[in-house]
UniProtKB/Swiss-Prot annotation:
Signal peptide: none annotated. The lineage of its organism: Bacteria, Bacillati, Bacillota, Bacilli, Lactobacillales. The keyword Transcription regulation applies. This is Heat-inducible transcription repressor HrcA. GO terms for biological process: negative regulation of DNA-templated transcription. One of its GO terms (molecular function) is DNA binding. Belongs to the HrcA family. Keywords: Repressor, Stress response, Transcription, Transcription regulation.
Length: 352
């Protein structure tokens, strides 16, 4: 652990550097410290912090910048989230205070709001679908070989997919299959629709001479409804953190955040990784070296979970440069996760 003075100096350097993005010298630190300390003392303490691996010296300046270890110490022991300004509060309330037709629309808007407010890349995943129940399934013929499968759940979401059947299936056959499927599925939660239940439905369909392709499209639309949808906004902001023109890296980074499975793994929230200081923050921060891809070595990922009661939990996240102003960003995520949860609870309340 550091002495109280060393902690003050480290915190001052990090807060100044994340605002100016310029190396911080001893005179700047001396002028910003809340206690009177000589420039020589500050220089000596900065040298100690550098020896401990918490500060780094740049080639172009006599000032210091935080190292990854310095940021981690700051995040674990020193940070105090900042309350968001009234203007930001008003913008969040305004953008969320409009009618939405589906949960996914709210979650998608959440990612956009966070990206607009921060100029970083933002992610948002909706509440888990484990408790969501099926309220109806339909198949609508579009042509002699093409149909649309529609699955409706009790949270107001509608999933639909278009399928091409290998042979003509008449309307009466489709209606019989739909009635049988609804008898088996309506009122069931998505998480309870397992292979055993689907096999029972398949046996009934085969016994009645229904096309086996109907079961395939049912499985596809259920899988789609149960899968976690991750919304991303502000991908272009990733480019601002690249100082060179390495197009290969940029393309790989874009590909990484365009893969839903990779994103779910990256954004996955672990309560044990919440900030360990006294701020009681529910925001998790991972620095570049702590992230699973070398492409993210100059980035930090801030993740927060929000709860919508019995409807489950969702996740919001920000991906930005390591030298971001953490106090402001953590304060923003803390407030935003609560506002998003309230908006979703209001939405779900319409279906009681």
């Amino acid at each position: 652990m550091l002495t109280e003075r060393q902690e003050l100096i480290l915190k001052t350097i990090i807060m100044d550097f994340t605002q100016t993005h310029e190396p911080v010298g001893s005179k700047t630190v001396m002028n910003q410290l809340p206690v009177k300390v000589s420039s020589a003392t500050v220089r000596n303490e900065m040298a100690v912090l550098e020896e401990k691996g918490l500060l780094e010296k740049t080639h172009s300046s006599s000032g210091r910048i935080p190292s990854t270890a310095g940021y981690r110490y700051y995040l674990d022991h020193l940070i105090n989230p900042v309350k968001i300004p009234t203007s930001v509060y008003n913008q969040i309330v305004y953008q969320l205070d409009r009618p939405f037709q589906q949960v996914n629309e709210i979650v998608q808007e959440a990612a956009k709001i966070l990206s607009d407010l921060t100029n970083y890349t933002a992610f948002a995943a909706g509440p888990e679908t484990h408790s969501v129940k099926v309220t109806g399934f339909r198949i609508v013929p579009l042509s002699s070989h093409q149909v649309m499968a529609i699955l409706v759940t009790d949270d107001g979401n509608v999933k639909n997919q278009i399928y091409t059947l290998p042979h003509h299936t008449n309307g009466e056959e489709i209606e019989k299959a739909v009635r049988l499927i609804n008898d088996q599925l309506v009122g069931k939660s998505l998480s309870s629709i397992n292979e055993v239940l689907l096999k029972r439905i398949a046996d009934h369909l085969i016994a009645r001479g229904s096309a086996p392709e109907i079961l395939d499209l049912l499985q596809d639309v259920i899988k789609d409804a149960a899968s976690e949808q991750m919304y991303v906004d502000g991908q272009i902001n990733l480019l601002s953190n690249y100082e060179n023109d390495d197009l290969t890296k940029i393309k790989s980074l874009y590909k990484l955040i365009d893969q839903n499975d990779a994103l779910s793994s990256l954004i996955g929230f672990n309560p044990e990784d919440e900030l360990k200081n006294d701020s009681s923050s529910k925001v998790q921060v991972k620095l570049g070296s702590e992230l699973p891809s070398d492409l993210l070595e100059n980035y930090s990922l801030l993740t927060a979970q929000y709860s919508v009661g019995k409807y489950g939990k969702g996740t919001i996240a920000l991906l930005g440069p390591t030298n971001m102003p953490y106090s402001q960003m953590i304060g923003l995520l803390e407030y935003f996760r609560n506002e998003l949860a309230k908006k979703l609870l209001d939405y779900y309340g319409r279906f009681k």
